Amino acid sequence: MSRLIIPSHSPNEEGNVVRVTPESVGWEYVGFEVYVLAKGQTLRKETKDQEACLVLLKGKANISTKLERWEQIGLRMDVFEKVPPYSVYVPANDVYEVEAMTDVEVAVCLAPGKGTYPARLIPPSEVGVEIRGAGNIERRVHNILPESQPADSLLVVEVFTPEGNWSSYPPHKHDQDNLPHESYLEETYYHKINPGHGFMVQRVYTDDRSIDETMVVKNGDVVLVPKGYHPVSAPPGYEGYYLNVMAGPVRTWKFHNDPDHDWVMESKLAAKQKEK
C-alpha cells in the first residue's frame, strides 16, 4: 500500500477509526482523526497546543467546551445527503466533549493553535456552498472553515464529486511558501464513497516526479498530500466525498495549477457559457 494512504480500521475503545499526527506522517502542521461513536458514548479530549474543528459527518450530538455547550446539533444522517454539516471550532488549551445522541461519526481536524479565538458553533447556515468547475470537472463544495472565517491555522472544506467526474482539477498544488502567488499547505483527504464498496482514484505528483503515485482509494481512507498536485477521479456508478484539512505557516490558500492542464478549466467554463 502507498505510504500516502492511511486506511481506517474498526473503532477502538474510544471510537477512533483513523488518526494522523504530524509525528506519525513526518510533517509539521496537520492532524486529523475520525471517531465513530455509538448512541450514548462520550468522547472527551484536550486540545493542548492545537486548535480543532469538529465536523459532524453524521448523527446528532451534544458538544461542550470549557465555556460553551451546544445540544442536539447535527442535521444529516449520511454525508451524501449533501447538506452542510454542523461543526464546532475549539481553540488551543481547551477541552471538548462529544456526547452521541444517535450513532455519530465526527471528524476532528487539527493544526497548531494560539488560543486567539473563542470556541464557537459553525451552523450549516454559515457554511458557504458553491458549485466549482463545469462539465465533468464540476463538483459541490462546502466551505466549513475558510480563510474568511477566524482561526489560527486551520482551513476545512468538504467536496462532493458526482460519478464520472474529476475533482481537485485542473491539478493544483500549494507546496511553496511564495506569497502572494502560492502558499505552503499540508493537506489530508478523508474519502467516503457511495455505494461504499466502490473506489476513487487519486494521483499525487510533483513537477520533478520525486512523488508520482496513482492510488486506488477506498471508503474511509485518508490520503496525505505533503506536496505536489493531487487530482481525484470518481468512476461511473460511484459518487465521491472528501473532507479536506489544510494548514501551513500562513493561513491562506494560494494554489498553482499544473501548466500542462491549466487550459482545461477555461475550456469547460466556455462550453458551459455556450449552453446558456
UniProtKB/Swiss-Prot annotation:
InterPro entries: Deoxy-glucuronate_isom_IolB (IPR024203), IolB_Bacilli (IPR023770), KduI/IolB_isomerase (IPR021120), RmlC-like_jellyroll (IPR014710), RmlC_Cupin_sf (IPR011051)
Top-level taxon in the UniProt lineage: Bacteria
Keyword Nucleotide-binding carried by entry: no
GO molecular function, one term: 5-deoxy-D-glucuronate isomerase activity
Pathway info: Polyol metabolism; myo-inositol degradation into acetyl-CoA; acetyl-CoA from myo-inositol: step 4/7
Known catalytic reactions: 5-deoxy-D-glucuronate = 5-dehydro-2-deoxy-D-gluconate
Coiled-coil regions listed in the entry: none
EC number(s) stated in the UniProt entry for this protein: 5.3.1.30
Listed GO biological process terms: inositol catabolic process
Sorted UniProt keywords: Isomerase
Main EC class the enzyme belongs to: isomerase
Functional description taken from the UniProt entry: Involved in the isomerization of 5-deoxy-glucuronate (5DG) to 5-dehydro-2-deoxy-D-gluconate (DKG or 2-deoxy-5-keto-D-gluconate).
Family per similarity comment: Belongs to the isomerase IolB family.
Name of this protein: 5-deoxy-glucuronate isomerase
Taxonomy of the source species: Bacteria, Bacillati, Bacillota, Bacilli, Bacillales
